[in-house]
């Protein structure tokens, strides 16, 4: 993440979350990156309240990069905040992937495709 961005905005913000996810894609030469930044607690940090979290997902496909970011305000213990942020990041990434799938591909799914894993 660009040091100037962090100096200007701090580490807990949407731009940093997207930069982290994009950095993961670039560093790992992948197609999908997920990042979280925030304060899980206990207590606030650097003026940011406990539970304030940003989750981001970045996907590259065919030379196009798509990103999404969400701000969350979560309650609970450190473990609860971290777990909720993780779930939110995965859901955001899932949403990006679903949006990239052609509608005809989604229509051809069978009920077995939708069944939860045991």
Each model region followed by its residue ranges:
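Short alpha-helical segments enriched in small residues
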Residues: 1-118
């Amino acid at each position: 993440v660009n040091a100037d961005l962090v100096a200007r905005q701090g580490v807990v913000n949407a731009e940093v979350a997207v930069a982290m996810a994009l950095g993961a894609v670039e560093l790992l030469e992948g197609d999908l990156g997920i990042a979280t930044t925030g304060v899980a607690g206990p207590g606030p940090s650097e003026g940011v309240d406990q539970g304030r979290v940003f989750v981001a997902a970045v996907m590259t496909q065919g030379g196009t990069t798509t990103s999404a970011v969400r701000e969350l305000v979560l309650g609970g213990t450190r473990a609860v905040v971290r777990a909720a942020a993780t779930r939110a990041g995965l859901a955001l990434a899932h949403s990006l992937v679903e949006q990239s799938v052609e509608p005809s591909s989604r229509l051809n799914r069978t009920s077995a495709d939708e069944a939860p894993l045991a």
